[in-house]
């Protein structure tokens, strides 16, 4: 996958910007708060209309304007081999609540606009930003989200299963919560309904865990090899799936803990309570990893995510790396600079000195104005 060009209008602090990226490395330099991450975020919106930083529609549109507009030309690897002169042309708009078309809409090759979420899967990308460091130190929810987000991009059917599981889980938790006096269901009725919900949860939960395990079998060797190279063999990373149940065992676990869940008033078991353990030299990274080690762990995971997607789909995602070199020693920086030249990569940095000798395109962002160096 390649981004051939991008035109940005009225997006956050960017009034107008034109980007013609290189085939491999494109660097956006500038001081903090100038709009570098905004430009990276604009590229990420092409993956399905969502921001990796969050934000309401009005927050994405430049102050005083009704719309933000992104116009991009993209080329898939298969197109590049077979139809090099026919890129996809994408137009994405973000409208404020009081505009003529509120919300996020996208049009591909002149077709009628549709919800931008429909772009999912058409522009594969992997993003790293400093907020992703919480993958290491944060709660298990963030690590589960990392796995599930990757799987949703790779397998559209996974999103269907995942949403169904969450919907049934919500119904179960509502049933388990204690109702106000006089509104409680009869005990027998409550247990009968709980059994029905658990049956559905077991079916969907088994599918979720199985897909996570299979994906991790592919991801783990890639991530661990990345970390070994990043650390020059000084440290060893391991990934383990911390499961609550063995394959085929969720139904029995739900039945065994049913009374405990009733007393607790909430669901206590299932894939929504599992974790991805990250270890450095056999020790939990969430406890012992330094800032630099945390960054190296997450970068190893993100590069592995891109490599795994390339193997599974035949399309290498575009890499978007925000402030990636901070808190890394010179050896790790040099390794990353080498890896960045393998596929199309966009990277932001406050300091351009590390990139001036590379073959990539270098831009500078200043007050929302983009210029080529």
Residue ranges and their predicted role:
Residues 72, 344-351:
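Structural recognition of the conserved hydrophobic beta-strand(s) that form the central parallel beta-sheet
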Residues 117-122, 129-199, 203:
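A conserved P-loop NTPase coupling/switch region
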Residues 36:
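Conserved lysine of the Walker
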Residues 48-142, 146-154, 158, 220, ...:
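Nucleotide-state sensing region of NTPase/ATPase domains
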Residues 322-324:
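Walker B catalytic acidic pair
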């Amino acid at each position: 996958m390649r981004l051939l060009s991008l035109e940005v209008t009225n997006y956050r602090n960017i009034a107008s910007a034109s980007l013609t990226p290189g085939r491999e490395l494109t660097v956006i330099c500038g001081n903090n708060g100038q709009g570098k991450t905004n430009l990276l975020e604009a590229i990420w919106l092409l993956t399905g209309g969502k921001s990796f930083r969050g934000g309401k529609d009005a927050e994405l549109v430049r102050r005083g304007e009704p719309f933000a507009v992104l116009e991009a030309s993209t080329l898939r690897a298969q197109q590049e081999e077979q139809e090099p002169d026919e890129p996809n042309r994408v137009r994405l708009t973000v409208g404020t609540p009081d505009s003529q078309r509120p919300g996020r809409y996208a049009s591909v090759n002149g077709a009628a606009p549709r919800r931008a979420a429909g772009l999912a899967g058409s522009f594969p990308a992997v993003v790293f930003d400093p907020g992703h460091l919480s993958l290491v130190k944060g709660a298990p929810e963030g690590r589960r989200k990392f796995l599930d987000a990757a799987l949703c991009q790779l397998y559209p059917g996974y999103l269907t299963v995942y949403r169904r599981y969450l919907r049934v889980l919500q119904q179960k938790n509502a049933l388990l919560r204690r109702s106000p006096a006089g509104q409680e269901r009869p005990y027998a009725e409550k247990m009968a309904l709980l059994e029905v919900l658990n049956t559905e949860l077991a079916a969907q939960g088994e599918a979720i865990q199985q897909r996570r395990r299979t994906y991790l079998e592919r991801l783990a060797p890639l991530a661990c090899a990345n970390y070994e190279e990043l650390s020059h063999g000084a440290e060893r990373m391991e990934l383990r799936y911390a499961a609550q149940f063995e394959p085929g065992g969720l139904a029995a676990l739900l039945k065994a803990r049913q009374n405990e869940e009733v007393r607790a008033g909430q669901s206590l078991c299932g894939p929504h309570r599992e974790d991805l353990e990250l270890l450095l030299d056999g020790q939990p990274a969430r406890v012992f990893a330094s800032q630099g080690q945390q960054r190296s762990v997450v970068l190893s995971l993100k590069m592995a995510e891109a490599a795994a997607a390339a193997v599974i789909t035949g399309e290498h995602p575009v890499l978007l790396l925000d402030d990636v070199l901070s808190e890394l020693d010179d050896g790790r920086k040099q390794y990353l600079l080498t890896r960045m030249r393998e596929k199309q990569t966009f990277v932001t940095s406050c300091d351009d000195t590390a990139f001036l000798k590379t073959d990539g395109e270098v831009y500078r962002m200043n007050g929302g104005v983009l210029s080529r160096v």
